Amino acid sequence: MLARHGPRYGGSVNGHSDDSSGDAKQAAPTLYIFPHAGGTAKDYVAFSREFSADVKRIAVQYPGQHDRSGLPPLESIPTLADEIFAMMKPSARIDDPVAFFGHSMGGMLAFEVALRYQSAGHRVLAFFVSACSAPGHIRYKQLQDLSDREMLDLFTRMTGMNPDFFTDDEFFVGALPTLRAVRAIAGYSCPPETKLSCPIYAFIGDKDWIATQDDMDPWRDRTTEEFSIRVFPGDHFYLNDNLPELVSDIEDKTLQWHDRA
C-alpha cells in the first residue's frame, strides 16, 4: 500500500490542469466519478474529499440534471455515454492519464465512456466499478412486464429515494420519464468481445440484492488486464460506510498503474 503524503505531481486537485509543461507521466492522474441513478455530482463530494492531492477528481454531472436528483433523460446507456464523452473531451489531453469510477448505473456509463476514451487513444489507467452488474448480467430483465407503479417502486429501492414522493399523483406523472430510464438500464448490454485494455476492479456490499457478487464477477471478461473483486460490509450503498477503505484502495491502484506507465 502506498504511503500517504503531500502531492507528488503539479497541477490542480479537483479539475484539469492547464499546465502543459513537463513530461506527461508527471501529470497527476484524473479520476472521473460517475454517480448512481438519481445521484448528482454533489452526492460524491465526501467521496472525492477522501482522496489525497495525488489524484485529481472530477465528478460527472449528467446532461439534463442541473444539480437535481433524479435520472437524466435516458434513451439508452450508449447514447448517454456519447453525450457525456462529447462533454468531457475538452477536459483531457490525449496523453493525460485517466481512470474511471462508477457506482450502480454510473458503472455502466463509466465503462462506456472509458471505452470511448480508449478508442480515442487516451491513457486509461484503470476502471473501478461499484455495485453494478456486468453487461449481459443485469437483473430485472422482467421490467417490461412490470406496471408503472411497480417499476417506480423498484427505482426507489435502487436509488434510496423517499417512496412517499410517488404517492402524489402529480409527482408520479412527472416521474414517468424515469420509467424509460429504468428500462434502458435494465436493457443495457454490449458485444462479448467489447473489452477494456486496462485492469478492472470491482467493489460490492455483502448485503446488496440489486447487484450480487455473481452478477459482478463477469466483469473479469471485460478486460485484457487483471481483475479483482472486493466485498465490503453493507448494502447497495455500502460505500457510505466504507469510504476510507474504498478510497484508499482506489487511489493506491490508480497510482500504482500510473507509475507503471
Swiss-Prot record:
Strongly inhibited in vitro by CyC17, a monocyclic enol phosphate analog to Cyclipostins, which binds covalently to the catalytic Ser-104 residue leading to a total loss of enzyme activity. Methyl arachidonyl fluorophosphonate (MAFP) inhibits esterase activity but it only reduces by approximately 50% thioesterase activity with palmitoyl-CoA as substrate. Thioesterase activity is inhibited by tetrahydrolipstatin (THL). It comes from the Bacteria. Gene3D superfamilies: alpha/beta hydrolase. GO terms for biological process: DIM/DIP cell wall layer assembly; lipid biosynthetic process; symbiont-mediated perturbation of host innate immune response. Optimum temperature is 37 degrees Celsius (with palmitoyl-CoA as substrate). The keyword Membrane does not apply. Pfam families: Thioesterase (PF00975). It is an enzyme of class 3 (hydrolase). Belongs to the thioesterase family. Involved in the synthesis of both phthiocerol dimycocerosates (PDIMs) and phenolic glycolipids (PGLs), which are structurally related lipids non-covalently bound to the outer cell wall layer of M.tuberculosis and are important virulence factors. In vitro, TesA has both thioesterase and esterase activities. Exhibits thioesterase activity on acyl-CoA derivatives such as palmitoyl-CoA and decanoyl-CoA. Also displays hydrolytic activity on ester substrates, being more active on pNP esters with short carbon chain lengths (C2-C5) than with those bearing medium and long carbon chain lengths (C8-C18). This is Thioesterase TesA. It comes from Mycobacterium tuberculosis (strain ATCC 25618 / H37Rv).
